[in-house]
Amino acid sequence: MGLAGTKTKQRFGLDPRNTAWSNDTSRFGHLQLEKFGWKPGMGLGMSPTSSHKTHIKVSIKDDNLGLGAKIKRTERKDEFDNGECAGLDVFQRILGRLNGKQEEISKELDIQRKQKIIDGKWGIHFVRGDVLASTWDPETKKLKSYSNDKKRSRDDDDEKLSSKNKSKKQKKDKKDKKDKKDKKDKKDKKDKKDKTEKKEKKEKKEKKEKKEKKDKKDKKDKKDKIDKKDKKDKKSLKNNIEVSTTASNIPSTVSTRLSVRSRWIKQKRAATMDSKALNEIFMVTNT
């Protein structure tokens, strides 16, 4: 294409080969294996020298196929290969005809053919999962049992101890709950008592303050009344003194044409100021 062609850029990350995690020697698994005697380059298992030394690869399953289905498909020669020997059913029919069991064999082969068709469309084949070689006995075809009497007795003792510890723990928990409940009840009672005492003290204090306020108010009212009465008496006495002084300050002779009128006013004022003259005017006798 040359320089005029479309340019495509390709970016590489910091770890394009994804080897940073495998080269990291500070991981927990790496350190733990080294504690058990493993060294880099060794394999795992009973014979580390001949075991698998590369990293375990995990592939994501994105289909509904069973285990080993993809491997089986890769082993097929073509798309028509179903993994069985071609012409085997025909050979079995010939053998059946020679042995005089043609009907039985043909019937069985028809049943097998129909069963394959049904299983191929709607059937499910279950594959038995393998177990560890150390736990499987091929002769008896059973799992090996390594339990013995000592282990059983030890397990029984452990169960007894665990049950005892459990019962002790339950008793302790019950006791702790009871103690906590008692403490809480005591605290609630004490708080209630303190509240009632505080309330009573507050009420007594309020009553006392009200009484003191009332007493102060009464004293103040009495004092105000006495002060008012004293002021009133002083004022009336002062007015009497002023009137008497004004009456005494009136000139004896008035050299005007209204001298007769002024004399009459003077006599009238003097008569009103004199209690004895007033008694004579109103004809009141002192007994």
From Swiss-Prot:
GO terms of biological process kind: rRNA processing
Comp. bias regions, Basic and acidic residues: 143-155, 191-200, 221-230
Region span, Disordered: 143-254
Biased composition (Polar residues): 239-251
Domain G-patch: 25-72
Keyword Cell membrane: no
Highest rank taxon of the organism: Eukaryota
Molecular function GO labels: nucleic acid binding
Entry GO terms, CC: nucleolus
Pfam families associated with the record: G-patch (PF01585)
Xref: InterPro entries: G_patch_dom, PINX1
Subcellular location: Nucleus, Nucleolus
Keyword Signal belongs to the record: no
Biased segments, Basic residues type: 163-190, 201-220
Keywords, ordered alphabetically: Nucleus, Ribosome biogenesis, rRNA processing
Family: Belongs to the PINX1 family.
Physiological role: Involved in rRNA-processing at A0, A1 and A2 sites and negatively regulates telomerase.
Annotated protein name in UniProt: Protein PXR1
Organism this protein belongs to: Vanderwaltozyma polyspora (strain ATCC 22028 / DSM 70294 / BCRC 21397 / CBS 2163 / NBRC 10782 / NRRL Y-8283 / UCD 57-17)
Taxonomic lineage: Eukaryota, Fungi, Dikarya, Ascomycota, Saccharomycotina
Gene field: PXR1
